[in-house]
Amino acid sequence: MIKSVKVTNYLGESVQLRLGELEPKSGLLITNIEGLGPAKANINTTEMATNDGDVYNSSRLQKRNIVITLRFGWAPTIEDARQNSYKYFPIKRRLELLFETDNRVCKAYGYVESNEPNIFSDESETKISIICVDPYFYSVDENVLLFYSMEPTFEFPFENDSLEEPLLEMGNIWLKTERTVYYTGDAETGVVINIHAVGPVRNVTIYNMGTREVMKIDTSRLEEMTGYGIIAGDDITISTIRGKKSVYLLRNGVKTNIINCLDKQADWFQLAKGDNVFNYTAEYGSVNLQFRITNQIVYEGV
């Protein structure tokens, strides 16, 4: 069951509308919402002259159309409530919709297509049409998977038997080159891979063990572009999200596009439902790498 909808306009102004309850400040009451299920798909096929039926070619999801019906209450007047709908649902502007249900919190982004109030009705209300060019809903929080961990080992009381040798141990860093991302979403999604170097590294290779996909970073190309390969302090961010694919290097506060340093046959990883096992290696300096993978959960409907 849907509990509430939080609307945030392009100016960052927001209002949270609980289903079945009049929001006292805005005077808005949700009576109906359409378009929250899976979006309609286009299935592209080709007719065969000599065979029955068609041959499947491809498929894609259409844009999503969410229609919200609002009833106006006293805030302090009906006119104020109607004008608040213009404020929170500005025509042609982008807004964020955050849906809270019994077992899911997700968000979608869209543009207000129309706001059509019935001004002269005894029960004044409006229908607001929102076009979501991205038909999916996304989790609010990101899943973060670390390939390293830090274990504190310093304890009180402590003893230092030497003033010359470093005998005190403050902590241990544990590195793992293989970890599993468990994905629970309805549709495939990309990931963001963050690589932090604490020392020199040569030629990094990342694997998706389940799909046999490979992504390689050629440090010789990186050296040609920047003067160095991967060195201590470097941060490399790889995004495999559709529509946002990128590879950037952050070095000494300067952000550089290094997508040309990827192998030409590189695969752009996508998470499938269930276990997704990732592994990384390097020709030299793999112990100098700290990996982190983040992803959002993608839902087909609320």
Predicted regions and their residues:
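Beta-strand elements of well-folded, non-transmembrane domains
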Residues: L70-W74, T101, S114, C132-Y136, ...
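Solvent-exposed loop and beta-edge segments used for protein-protein assembly and interaction
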Residues: R60-R64, F89-I91, D102, F120-S124, ...
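Intrinsically disordered, low-complexity segments enriched in serine, threonine, and glycine
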Residues: L145-V302
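Short beta-strand and beta-hairpin "edge-sheet" elements
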Residues: R94-S139
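Long, hydrophobic/aromatic-enriched structural stretches that serve as scaffold segments
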Residues: Q62-Y111
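Oligomerization/assembly interface segments of phage tail-like spikes and tubes
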Residues: N51-P76, D122-P135, N276
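Polar/acidic, low-complexity leader/linker segments enriched in S/T/G and N/D
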Residues: M1-T45
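Short, charged, solvent-exposed linker or helix-capping segments at domain edges/interfaces
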Residues: Y138-L146
